[in-house]
């Protein structure tokens, strides 16, 4: 006499399917978190933006503009036209499509949370405001830095990269 095992097989299939679905959902959520962290790191610590910021910092020091920025004690936008008065092609050097809304903006702030936080009101871009809140949360403002230069390079209107250079 044969036993009818169809009910047991059906229960086994359901249990195994639930286990497999649970594992796949867990993997998906973990990979989504990793992808978000990578995207944040990629946008907030962009290499091109780093080199541009360091180049402008060196030029501000060389031209003596940095002393003016420090003495005013205000957070403000850096006038890049003064820095690059002899070279108007710095947009093309960084693949900036100005026709599609691309731009380069740089901001100066003393190295404290309030000065950095005040920069959020100077730019209407939502991702810039997110970056400023990221800076306020992730930096230790008790360190002995003097000022920050924060750069926003937007290749197009909605493809923006950032870097915050802390200077002693």
Regions found by a protein language model. Name each.
Residues 3-53:
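Aliphatic-rich helix starts adjacent to a transmembrane/signal segment
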Residues 119-168:
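Low-complexity, S/T/G/P-rich flexible repeat/linker segments used as non-globular hinges
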Residues 53-77:
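Alpha-helix exit/C-cap motif
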Residues 70-123, 135:
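Low-complexity, serine/threonine/proline-enriched polar segments
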Residues 14, 76, 94, 130, ...:
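Residue-level marker of intrinsically disordered, low-complexity segments enriched
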Residues 56-63, 104-110, 147-151:
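Extended low-polarity, hydrophobic cluster-rich segments
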């Amino acid at each position: 006499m044969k036993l009818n095992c169809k009910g047991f097989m059906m229960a086994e299939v359901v249990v195994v399917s639930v286990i497999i679905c649970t594992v796949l959902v867990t993997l998906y959520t973990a990979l989504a978190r990793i992808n978000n962290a990578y995207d944040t790191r990629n946008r907030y610590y962009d290499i091109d933006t780093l080199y541009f910021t360091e180049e402008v910092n060196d030029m501000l020091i060389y031209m003596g503009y940095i002393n003016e920025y420090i003495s005013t004690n205000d957070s403000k936008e850096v006038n890049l036209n003064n820095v690059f008065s002899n070279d108007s092609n710095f947009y093309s050097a960084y693949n900036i499509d100005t026709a599609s809304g691309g731009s380069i903006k740089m901001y100066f702030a003393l190295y404290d949370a309030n000065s950095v936080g005040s920069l959020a009101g100077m730019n209407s871009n939502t991702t810039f405001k997110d970056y400023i809140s990221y800076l306020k949360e992730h930096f230790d403002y008790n360190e002995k830095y003097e000022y920050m230069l924060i750069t926003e390079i937007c290749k197009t209107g909605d493809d923006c990269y950032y870097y915050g250079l802390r200077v002693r």
